[in-house]
Amino acid sequence: MDAYKVLEIKKSVFENNDREADLLREELKKDETFLLNLMSSPGSGKTTTVLRTIEALKDQMKIGVLEADIDSEVDANIVAKTGAKVIQLHTGGMCHLDAGMTKQGLLGLGTEDVDLVILENVGNLVCPAEFDTGASKNAMILSVPEGDDKPLKYPLMFSIVDVLLINKIDAMANFDFDFEAVKERVRKLNPNIKVIPISAKTGEGIKEWVVWLSTEVKNWQAK
């Protein structure tokens, strides 16, 4: 008889988190609050996209924002100037948020009468894809300067998101970026994904993005 046990810690952690995420989703559903988990690598334009989104939707719905960073309040201070409710989450060195951390943030934010909460996850293409936050939908930003090979290098991230925003299309002429190749690679991983080209800087494509998002929020609240 073996004198030790083998514990599948990673499997156990994921299973526990998945259960907590499902419970959180049920709570948000009852409150009619839509949670968007927005992921990307650092420097992709997440915060600028969040600002554009708030500006476009602030007269249609009440919006809250959870800003996740390892250690900083820069983005939270910027977003707070829009008038949206903001909570800064410091992950203490962790490169992602899980369902428990997200719930803590939502409790701090207060979701009463909040239609949409945007969770700006930690800038990383690996860890955030592995942990269900309890979000209603998952979104990702890929910026043109990052290159068109990211779906090949980080397939899990592209396979779990509902919508992909390809940002910084205003800089397309300056980079060797094959937009059609990205769409083809992504749809092999995730056939139902919505792909929207945008420029958070100029505002191009933002209308299509907010129409998609507002429709998802309404559908979530109507079910």
What are these regions (language model features)?
Residues 69, 167, 199:
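Active-site glycine-centered loops adjacent to acidic/histidine catalytic or metal-binding residues
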Residues 90, 142, 199:
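Residues at the C-termini of beta-strands that transition into short coil/loop
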Residues 171-223:
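Canonical P-loop GTPase G-domain recognition
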Residues 23, 153, 205:
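Short acidic active-site motifs
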Residues 3-26, 31-39, 44, 53-136, ...:
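Nucleotide-state-sensitive switch-loop elements of NTP-binding domains
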